């Protein structure tokens, strides 16, 4: 999958590993619903994928920063891995994060370091899109408990674990599948 084959690129800068799994699975389901093929590029160390259709190919790149406070440093990744490796591609950047609370003011993600991040990637990005979950992403994911259970390979009758936070509940579900692996 060479960069010269594609004319569009989608760069997902996600807050953490859970968001990465969520958005990759969501993208996979969207592609399947639209009859598009999504495949991982096994020739690179980057999280690089291709969406193939009758109209051509789109490059998808994913970077997980593992903390919303580190997301502002991802302009370097975008410049190196996306634009640097594929200068001929028109890029749309998705900033994927959760606000941690349903009533958080999303405008804080347009100020300070966040404004500098947007400014840093804007010259090379055709468009910058916020994909902000107005809660913890784990709480959003658990709104579709049957889908989560199916994804984890758990029986449909598995009950929602106890806990106040979605992350705690999701961790308990994950441990039912992989008790000896870190969440």
Residue spans for each PLM region:
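Short, surface-exposed loop/strand segments
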Residues: 1-88
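Short glycine-/polar-rich loops that comprise or flank the Walker A/P-loop
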Residues: 7-8, 89-91, 123-128
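Acidic beta-strand-to-loop metal/phosphate-binding motif
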Residues: 11-14, 89-104
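Activity-critical C-terminal alpha-helical subdomain
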Residues: 96-182
